Amino acid sequence: MIQVERLSRSYDSFRAVAEVSFAIGHGEVVGLLGHNGAGKTTIMKMLTGFLEPSAGTIHIDGQDIQTRRQAVQSLIGYLPENCPLYPEMTVIDYLDYQAGLHGVPGAQRPGLIRRAIARTWLEAKALEPIATLSRGYRQRVGVAQAILHRPRLLILDEPTNGLDPAQIQQMRILIRDLAREATVILSTHILQEVQAVCDRVLILRAGALVLDARLADLNRTRQLSLVVDRSPATVEPLLRTIPAITAIQHRPTTAERHEYLLDLDLGSAAAANDPLVIAPQVAQAVTHGGCQLFTLQPRTRDLETLFRELDDQPLGEARHG
């Protein structure tokens, strides 16, 4: 549904987004994750047509947003980080006003407004002035205006920003519900939000895309973690006799223990995603070489660990999980 190619945005000499490319299919729930200033909001604004890219292309539902901006925008519901609300208006009047901005015909507005209010659990607040609402309810009003016209793509920028734990949980439930009918892109700097509601994550760093992976695949590494009592001078020659080991990374833990991360090439066999298939060879090689084996296990990583690793690496091409 979304095809982004080499997207860039510069402000004078500052490059806010640098040649970002990705594709998102219909029905996916994708988290756009990065520190503040990583380029998330800039990408959101370019996806919605509110900001022109300096270079690159965006196609949504097969249409170029540069040449078909209005048609593309009719497919999108957008919740900006600070959604502009009119505090003197009631919720229902504000949604009627927004329906007009979305081009919803007058005859269709009552039904669509009722639907948006019901989906965001605003029935009890529909006649209340927005000024009287809590932050959590105001965020729901922002979501309600984004889904009024039944968009095919829903873009949410920091939807849980400033909410308390109970309100965050309610917003997560709402996002999962909305994802039944629309593709959802969720921008956040909070790891837990991506883990709670997303199927896939795009991680940005300094305007560059450094990871594109499905969350379910993050724990499926082709690496073994080996801990023995010997230094690389002894261990690495033993490990290099095993053809499936393509790289060895040494991580000393104590004077008596050394950890080695082993990158594996297991081919295309059915067991290719299970690094344990090579573990017996590794164990045999190091023990026959006189090493004391402490642990040998598949390396696992969660999103927090991966995010920290990416922060420590030099910027380069995006990694795909």
PLM regions and their residue ranges:
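ABC transporter nucleotide-binding domain
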Residues: 170-266
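Short secondary-structure boundary/hinge segments and terminal tails
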Residues: 76, 117, 135, 219, ...
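ABC transporter nucleotide-binding domains
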Residues: 2-4, 9-205, 209-211
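Hydrophobic/anchoring residues in structured secondary elements
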Residues: 9, 247-250, 298
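C-terminal coupling/interaction segments
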Residues: 267-321
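Surface-exposed charge patches
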Residues: 97, 115, 237, 284, ...
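Positions that flank functional sites
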Residues: 114, 132, 253-255, 301
